[in-house]
Regions:
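Proline-centered loop/turn at the N-terminus of a beta-strand
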Residues: 104, 189, 260-262, 278, ...
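Active-site-proximal beta-strand elements of phosphoester/diester hydrolases
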Residues: 189-193, 304-305, 344-348
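Catalytic beta-strand/loop cores that center a nucleophilic Ser/Cys/Thr
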Residues: 299-341
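Cysteine-nucleophile active-site neighborhood
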Residues: 226, 230-231, 236-314, 355-365, ...
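RNA-binding accessory domains that recognize and position tRNA/RNA substrates
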Residues: 1-222, 226-227, 241, 353-355, ...
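A glycine-centered loop/beta-turn motif at secondary-structure junctions
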Residues: 335-375
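Residue-level structural signal for beta-strand termini and adjacent loop
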Residues: 11-13, 54, 307, 338, ...
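Short acidic-glycine loop/turn motifs at beta-strand connectors
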Residues: 2-3, 121, 296-298, 339-340
Length: 376
C-alpha cells in the first residue's frame, strides 16, 4: 500500500507477467454474498477490492449472475479462498474466472486489518505483486499509480455501439406447474446511457415494462432526443464524475428537454453536476450491501447496496434540487429530485445485484413519471 504497509499472502487468479499483477485504489466491500456481481461491476474499474467476509468462492461462478461480460477490478483480496465449489448453478471457480481475465487475487490476508487501515487512513493506492523480494519497490509503484481523482474511466467501460436490451427477465427456478416467467408489456421507450451499466439495472428496467436502448457514454443529447424516448436513464460507472464533462453536458440538455430522467450512482453524480452542483471524493467510499438510507419523504429506512467513492456536495445543491435520501452512516447525499422537472436520482443501487431490494419502488416511480408525461 502507498503508506508503506505490506501484507503477504498466497496468489491466485492471474499469473504475474511482470513485476506487478494488479494496481489501483484499494477499497473494502462489506457484502457477505455476491462476490461475482462485485467482480463484474464496471464501477470497480481501477480498484482493488477487499472482501470483509471471511471465506469467498464457495459457490463458484455461473454465467447468469454476471453484471457485465467480464471482471473489471484491478485486483481481489480475500481472507480465505474456498478450496471447494459447492453450488448447483456453478460452472467454474473464482480462481478460474480471475485467471481467464488476467485479474490478480491474493488470499491469506488479514482483511480486518486492511479494512481498518483504509477506514482510518482513507483510500490508498496499492499493488498486488508476486515479486515478494522487493517490498520497497512495490510500495513505490503504488505511490506512482494514478489516483482516481480526475480520471475518466467511463470511456474504458462503456459500450462501443448502441444496442437494444432484450434479455429475458430471470426470476430464478420456478415449479413446472407455474409455467414460464411472464414478460410485462413494454410500455415505455427508455434510452439508457452506459457509463458502466450493470445488467441487473437493465433487467430491472425491462421487468418494469421498459423497452431499453443502450447508448455509449459520449452520445450527444441531440442523438438521444432524436430517438424520441419516453425517459432517459443515467447509469452507474467508475471514476471521477467531474472528469466526464461530455456526460454532464448531455444530461443538462436532456433535463432542459423536460424528459423524465432517473440516475443511479455515477448517473446521480453526473445529474448533480448538470444541475449546477459539485462533487467530492469520500474518505474511503461506500461499498457493500448493508448501508442504511433514510427516505426523507416517508421517514422510512432502506437497507441498500452501494458502490461509490465520490458524492454530491449537499451545500452545492441548495436551490437547485431537493434532498430526498440521506445516508444514516455519514449523512451524505443519497438521493435528490428536481423541484419542477420529472428528474430524480439516487446514489445507491436500488436494483441491488447483490443486496436487498428495499428500493425497487424507484423503478416504478420512474415508469410513473413517464406515464404521467404521456397523459399530458
Amino acid at each position: 500500500m502507498e503508506d508503506g504497509t505490506v501484507y503477504r499472502g498466497f496468489g491466485f487468479g492471474a499469473e504475474d507477467s511482470g513485476n506487478v499483477t494488479g494496481a489501483g485504489e484499494i477499497v473494502f466491500n462489506t457484502a457477505i454474498t455476491g462476490y461475482q456481481e462485485v467482480l463484474t461491476d464496471p464501477s470497480y474499474r481501477g480498484q482493488i477490492v477487499t472482501m470483509t467476509a471471511p471465506e469467498i468462492g464457495n459457490v463458484g461462478i455461473n454465467p447468469v449472475d454476471f453484471e457485465s461480460a467480464r471482471p473489471w477490478c484491478a485486483g481481489f483480496v480475500v481472507r480465505e479462498l474456498s478450496p471447494v465449489v459447492s453450488n448447483w448453478r456453478a460452472s467454474g471457480s473464482l480462481h478460474e474466472l480471475l485467471a481467464a481475465h488476467g485479474v490478480a487475487g491474493i488470499t491469506g490476508i488479514d482483511t480486518r486489518a486492511v479494512t481498518r487501515r483504509i477506514r482510518l487512513s482513507g483510500a490508498q493506492r496499492a499493488v498486488i505483486t508476486r515479486k515478494v523480494d522487493d517490498p520497497a519497490g512495490a510500495v513505490a509503484r503504488a505511490r506512482n499509480h494514478p489516483s482516481l481523482e480526475g480520471r475518466d474511466l467511463v470511456r474504458e467501460v462503456t459500450t462501443a455501439a448502441t444496442y437494444g436490451w432484450d434479455e429475458p427477465v430471470w426470476e430464478g427456478p420456478r415449479a413446472p406447474s407455474r409455467g414460464p416467467v411472464e414478460v410485462p408489456a413494454l410500455r415505455h421507450n427508455v434510452v439508457a446511457y452506459d457509463y458502466g451499466i450493470k445488467r441487473g439495472i437493465l433487467r430491472r428496467l425491462r421487468s418494469s415494462g421498459c423497452r431499453v436502448t443502450v447508448v455509449p457514454a459520449a452520445t450527444p443529447a441531440r442523438e438521444v432526443l432524436a430517438i424520441k424516448p419516453d425517459g432517459v436513464f443515467l447509469s452507474n460507472g467508475p471514476g471521477d464524475p467531474a472528469a466526464v464533462g461530455y456526460a454532464v453536458e448531455a444530461a443538462r440538455e436532456i433535463c432542459a428537454a423536460k424528459l423524465p430522467v432517473f440516475g443511479i450512482c455515477l448517473g446521480h453524480q453526473i445529474l448533480g453536476l448538470a444541475l449546477g452542483g459539485k462533487t467530492y471524493k469520500l474518505k474511503f467510499g461506500h461499498h457493500g450491501a448493508n448501508h442504511p438510507v433514510m427516505d426523507l419523504g416517508t421517514r422510512k429506512v432502506e437497507i441498500t447496496s452501494q458502490n461509490h467513492g465520490f458524492a454530491v456536495d449537499v451545500d452545492s445543491m441548495a436551490g437547485k434540487a431537493v434532498l430526498s435520501h440521506v445516508s444514516l452512516n455519514d449523512k451524505t447525499v443519497e438521493g435528490m429530485r428536481h423541484g419542477e422537472l420529472p428528474v430524480f436520482s439516487v446514489q445507491y443501487h436500488p436494483e441491488a445485484s447483490p443486496g436487498p431490494n428495499d428500493a425497487n419502488y424507484l423503478f416504478d416511480r420512474f415508469c410513473a413519471s413517464m406515464e404521467e408525461r404521456r397523459r399530458r
